[in-house]
Design a protein with these regions (language model features):
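EAL-family c-di-GMP phosphodiesterase catalytic domain
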Residues: 75-76, 92-93, 145-152, 171-186, ...
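The cytosolic transmitter module of two-component sensor histidine kinases
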Residues: 9, 13, 49-52, 116, ...
Length: 327
């Protein structure tokens, strides 16, 4: 819908219809919406999406996408030798486009699988470089989109890339979101089993954001459960959240599934998670996502510590001190 009185400019009928069409396009992508009223923000957003769309393929060819690594800190040792691979877009003009601005457009235009594979290849290349240099490396997790996961050749494609770079088993972890897990449980179980047989580790991301099912943990052979950051935000239900978190961790520990807490930002959260035997932590309290060279410097430092005398990270110790001071 486009109201004539809302337009500051004098338009011909074609221009008016053009703006109504902009509004119509937003209805197609919205949930439970039957109409939309045009305003300038709609046109700006659609023009922005079009500009992203027009340069997506070329940007992939030009390798404008950078892989960043967000370390995961082991709460027992305090070492950060594992990480999650994330993507950033640095245009040829030097502009950094955050993932929330381009990933939804890649998904909408069915190009997200190409981006997934691009990141996966970059991670494999990083691991191979370290192995060839005789440097230690630990598990790196990569995110897989719904579209990628349901590709008929998904497992074979990723296995072929893994084999091309000669990556040993268990150094690559495939992250799938909880929402994917509930689309088709039978297909999920089959695909996860295939991935495991090819030497991949499997993690469920964003656990707790959807209709989590305990049968999923019982029937699907996952290795890692990532507890969503929504459990750790300040809320009036903090005590109940902590009870739920402890229950989840107790359960999955008994199932030999490792736990990662996401979005951790305070010493109080670290102390609590250490007290309930969470395995790893990821969040700004320790590290933001880092470019490859900075992550590699951390790896080299952490492994040097590990080879001499393993010691807890200073921030883990700070969290333990927080516990002593507040109890």
């Amino acid at each position: 819908i486009c109201y004539l009185e809302d337009l500051a400019e004098d338009l011909q009928i074609e221009g008016i219809l053009d703006r109504a069409n902009y509004a119509r396009k937003t209805v197609k992508t919205g949930l439970n919406r039957k109409y939309a009223v045009y305003d300038e923000s709609i046109r700006k957003q659609l023009r922005y999406e079009k500009s992203i769309e027009n340069r997506m393929l070329k940007s992939l060819e030009n390798e404008e996408f950078l892989v960043y690594f967000q370390p995961k800190v082991d709460l027992q040792t305090g070492l950060a030798t594992q990480a999650e691979a994330l993507v950033r877009w640095q245009t040829d003009e030097g502009l950094i486009i955050p993932p929330d601005k381009f990933i939804p457009i890649f998904e909408k235009k069915y190009l997200i699988s190409s981006l997934d594979q691009y990141v996966f290849k970059k991670v494999c290349a990083f691991i191979r470089r370290r192995l060839d240099a005789g440097l230690p490396v630990n598990t790196i997790s990569v995110n897989v989109s719904r579209l990628q996961f349901y590709n008929s050749d998904f497992v074979k494609t990723y296995e072929d890339i893994k084999n091309k770079f000669r990556i040993p088993d268990h150094l690559l972890e495939i992250e799938i979101t909880e929402s994917i897990a509930f689309d088709n449980v039978t297909f999920l179980e089959k695909t996860v089993s295939e991935l495991k047989s090819k030497g991949f580790l499997i993690s469920i991301d964003d656990f707790g954001t959807g209709f989590s099912s305990l049968s999923l943990l019982k029937n699907i052979p996952i290795d890692v459960l990532k507890i969503d950051q929504s459990f750790f935000r300040e809320s009036i239900h903090k005590e109940k959240d902590n009870i739920v978190i402890k229950g989840i961790i107790d359960l999955v520990n008994k199932l030999s599934i490792r736990t990662v807490a996401e979005g951790i930002e305070t010493a109080e959260q670290v102390a609590f998670l250490k007290s309930v035997n969470c395995n790893m932590i990821q969040g700004y309290f320790f590290y933001r996502p880092l470019p490859e060279d900075k992550f590699e410097a951390i790896l080299n430092k952490e492994y040097a510590v590990k080879e001499t005398a393993p010691a807890a990270d200073s921030k883990v110790l700070a969290a333990e001190n927080w516990t002593l001071q507040n109890n």
